[in-house]
Amino acid sequence: MPSLKTKGAAGKFASLLLVLALSACSRPAPPPETSGELRVGTRNSPATFYIGHDGETAGFEHDLILAFSRAQNWTLSWTEKSRPQALFDMLERREIHLAAAALPQAVVKDRHLISGPILFETPVHVVYRTADRAPRGVAGLAGKKLAFIIGSGHGPMLMRLKRKHPELSWAAVENVWPEELLAQLQAGKYDAVIINGMDFDAMRNFYPGLAVAFDLPYKQKIVWALSPGSSHAFRNALARFVERARSDGTIKRALERYFGHVKRLGSSDILGILQRRPQRLPDLREHFQEAQTLSGIDWRLLAAIGYQESQWNRLATSPTGVRGVMMLTGETADRMGVSDRLNARESILGGARYLALLKDALPARIAEPDRTWLALAAYNQGQGHLEDARRIAQARGGDPNSWADVKEALPYLSRGSYAKVMKYGYARGGEALRFAENIRNYYDILLRLEPEYDPLINLGRGEDGLPPPG
């Protein structure tokens, strides 16, 4: 998941200010049905709304709100607040039409606001440091420093649990984001924290020392909160949109985009890339950046592929004969003009050319980011086997242009259940799935830790990123 603190060019920053400009006017917002403008309050969160590495707004709820506003032909304005209470106040003053901030339905109803349709349900985790002994059940939290965020909806459940476990105690903290709460847990301020799965899943790759001990015996229903003055026409339009988004796969694809890959890596995998990054990546960074210039593919994605393939080992060789940083086969190396697969620069440029070729070979109607994830599967098992998986996805009633549907079809390549639609025969489809999903995770980590590369901005700079003296 991209960092919440993304540096961009001046133009991107200006756009961000426009998108997140706080309303200076406290007058009630006119209904979107008459004004043609949908005003939404949100919070900056990797699960909800953030600025991506390309300077564009993104996030699970962001994508759904954007689709809703487009379906109604309304313009869209965002107001960002750091606390749910501030969003609730704006709703009560009718300054915004709805709030989208991973809000539990129970919290919305407790505030006597209008709950939109349920978007999805998320488990509630008890998260601890893996260096400590994992608490076993609620009884194991006795005597522990436990914390949760005020307004998260966890208080009522804890009060009910305390009736059976009177020794249970906790700190209810405010003015922090879930990411900050996890950082405090990792730093030792608390022994365990309560956080919903939506928030933890979005950040688990950045806290390899934390893990889920167990889930509390309830799930949270995530909804959008509507202003008390919302018209029936607005509520009905929202209900129809959510119903359609659930049936046509829009919600499924959004969940896949932001959360579908985040549980693939184990703690050792995350620690591995964090430890090897300062040791091995510096010698390869300029080659990955050159490959970006030639292919147009983000160098951090190419570096993620290189890590998945060889852990950035330029001399890597497998028993099957694939070699080098990008672990190219002899045939692929010949096609891409690579004469020495153990030459790091040649291997990286060859891998970038190959991925660009695979992306270009896909039908033009396939949009990003699905286009890239599908190309990664083809990078691992070949274009022909990817096309078989797309045919299987379609035969199963899915969308062959959606990674969310094709990823479910990939394992069938090794089962033969759909042999009649498989032109290219058996393949290790599950391996292609793991390959693509691992790379997505490594890419998320590198997006957070490594700056973007702009060849024009970096023109004339040295290896340290600084301009020449004088």
Curated annotation (Swiss-Prot):
GO cellular component, one term: cell outer membrane
Entry's localization field: Cell outer membrane
Catalyzed chemical reaction(s): Exolytic cleavage of the (1->4)-beta-glycosidic linkage between N-acetylmuramic acid (MurNAc) and N-acetylglucosamine (GlcNAc) residues in peptidoglycan, from either the reducing or the non-reducing ends of the peptidoglycan chains, with concomitant formation of a 1,6-anhydrobond in the MurNAc residue
Alphabetical list of CDD domains matching this protein: MLTF-like, PBP2_YfhD_N
Segments for region (LT domain): 263-470
Transmembrane segments: none
Residues annotated as catalytic: E309
Pfam families from the UniProt entry: SBP_bac_3, SLT
Chain intervals for the UniProt region annotation (Non-LT domain): 25-262
GO BP terms in the entry: cell wall macromolecule catabolic process; cell wall organization
Gene3D superfamilies tied to this protein: 1.10.530.10, Periplasmic binding protein-like II
Function: Murein-degrading enzyme that degrades murein glycan strands and insoluble, high-molecular weight murein sacculi, with the concomitant formation of a 1,6-anhydromuramoyl product. Lytic transglycosylases (LTs) play an integral role in the metabolism of the peptidoglycan (PG) sacculus. Their lytic action creates space within the PG sacculus to allow for its expansion as well as for the insertion of various structures such as secretion systems and flagella.
Family: In the N-terminal section; belongs to the bacterial solute-binding protein 3 family.
Protein's recorded name: Membrane-bound lytic murein transglycosylase F
Organism: Thiobacillus denitrificans (strain ATCC 25259 / T1)
Gene it is expressed from: mltF
